């Protein structure tokens, strides 16, 4: 398959419902990405799909296009009740559910189908008010969906389409029992269109597809290369004492337009945030302890460009559609090999190039061999001159609880620090 981001296949070439094509073209979507070109012929023919593709390759639009087309082309059951959605899209995190909902809104506006959103943390009554008026497509996280179902606010007996996004992450977060609970309350698999999409399709995910789908077709895009070919990967071996100064020096040298820094723990993320905020960077903090409204605001500020750097745990590593991320820093090498792929997949998206920089410190260097085995190649190593690391650094800011902590706007040019060799 061509390595280009878009294929020659156009959405208008398929027998899609005219309103769906109109909505796509209005948003500037004309040509399909590889995963869309593979999925749509199957879903339009009523076949179930389990799809694997690198993040940022259009999985969301593949299943949204299929969902809207199916609902427009097949009427709802005759005795459908107001609390019965016709399609259910399940996501592992609140942020991903919100982003899927945002991506679906232009299609909903063009087609007249109603959207609902259900996620935990806040907004219970607001979400419920929308559901009580009746929705066609319900997007949500499993916990809140089960809550509404147990109270009979929603009934899944009229489901015509079901989507499971980031299925491997569902397993990682322990949601698989919830998913099975929801599936048991839907019509049989052969009476609905089933789609499962993820950046990785492990054995356990395939087992779930076998259980809950109707003879699904497996489709894959570039499975032989787990890390995007547009991403420049780079690895440093700092001591624990030099690690923070190396990160700050690299940021000054690279001066990224939009960067995400990943660390393995909430405490480490707070520490990184404190150093960067004190040094005048516009930096946001995203961990599981940050309140939901604040998390969404931080993501919005980062997406708009009001923040240059986002420091995050792996809560932000999967599924989030943040455009134009130029750099990803792995301050800590992840314990899970798949998380490395998902982290660096935040950059190099939508045909753009990206830069991933990883720090293999004394604490996490032991994770490197498994990561390199998993991705199928060694990460190129760069050296640095310890004497050139930044030393004129302010005392880090401290916080008693996670908050956004925007530093002042960066001014002037970056300090001229160069690496060795």
Swiss-Prot record:
Tell me which domain of life the UniProt entry assigns to the organism this sequence originates from: Bacteria
Motif placement: DEAD box = 165-168
Q: Where is this region: Disordered?
A: 392-421
Q: SMART domains, from UniProt?
A: DEXDc, HELICc
Taking the first listed entry, what is the main subcellular location of this protein, grouped into a coarse class?
cytoplasm
Which biological process, per GO, is one annotated for this protein? RNA catabolic process
Q: Which Gene3D superfamilies match?
A: P-loop containing nucleotide triphosphate hydrolases
- An example of a Pfam family matching this protein is DEAD
Coiled-coil ranges from the UniProt annotation: none
Composition bias of kind Low complexity appears in 402-414
Please give the HAMAP family that the UniProt record associates with this protein. Answer: DEAD_helicase_RhlB
What this protein is called in its record is: ATP-dependent RNA helicase RhlB
Q: What is the lineage of its organism?
A: Bacteria, Pseudomonadati, Pseudomonadota, Gammaproteobacteria, Enterobacterales
Its gene? rhlB
């Amino acid at each position: 398959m061509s390595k280009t981001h878009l294929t020659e296949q156009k959405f208008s070439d398929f027998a899609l419902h005219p309103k769906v094509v109109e909505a796509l073209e209005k948003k500037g979507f004309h040509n399909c990405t590889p995963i869309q070109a593979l999925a749509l012929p199957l879903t339009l023919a009523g076949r179930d799909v389990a799809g694997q593709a690198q993040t940022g390759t259009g999985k969301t639009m593949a299943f949204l296009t299929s969902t809207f087309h199916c609902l427009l082309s097949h009427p709802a059951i005759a005795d459908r009740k107001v609390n019965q959605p016709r399609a259910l899209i399940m996501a592992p995190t609140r942020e991903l559910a919100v982003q899927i909902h945002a991506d679906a809104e232009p299609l909903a506006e063009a087609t007249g189908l109603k959207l609902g959103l259900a996620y935990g943390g806040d907004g219970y009554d607001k979400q419920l008010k929308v559901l009580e008026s009746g929705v066609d497509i319900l997007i949500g996280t499993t916990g809140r969906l089960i809550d509404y179902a147990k109270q009979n606010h929603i009934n899944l007996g009229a489901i015509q389409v079901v989507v499971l996004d980031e299925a491997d992450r569902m397993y990682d977060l322990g949601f698989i029992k919830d998913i099975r609970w929801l599936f048991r309350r839907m019509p049989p698999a052969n009476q609905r269109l089933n789609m499962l999409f993820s950046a990785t399709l492990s054995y356990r995910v395939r087992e779930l597809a076998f259980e809950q789908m109707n003879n699904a077709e497996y489709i894959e895009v570039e499975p032989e290369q787990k890390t995007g070919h547009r991403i420049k990967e780079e690895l440093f071996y700092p001591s624990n004492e030099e690690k923070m100064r190396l990160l700050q020096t690299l940021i000054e040298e690279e001066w990224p337009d939009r960067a995400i820094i990943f660390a393995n723990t909430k405490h480490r993320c707070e520490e990184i945030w404190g150093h960067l905020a004190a040094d005048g960077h516009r930096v946001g903090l995203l961990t599981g302890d940050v309140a939901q409204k604040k998390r969404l605001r931080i993501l919005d500020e980062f997406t708009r460009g009001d923040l240059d750097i986002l420091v995050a745990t792996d809560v932000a590593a999967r599924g989030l559609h943040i455009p134009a991320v130029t750099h990803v820093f792995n301050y800590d090498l992840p314990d899970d090999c798949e998380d490395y792929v998902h982290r660096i997949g935040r950059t190099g998206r939508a045909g753009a190039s990206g830069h991933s920089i990883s720090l293999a410190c004394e604490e996490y260097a032991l994770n490197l061999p498994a990561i390199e085995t998993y991705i199928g190649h060694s990460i190129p190593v760069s050296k640095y001159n310890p004497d050139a690391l930044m030393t004129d650094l302010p005392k880090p800011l401290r916080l008693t609880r996670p908050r956004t902590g925007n530093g002042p706007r960066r001014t002037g040019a970056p300090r001229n620090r160069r690496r060795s060799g």
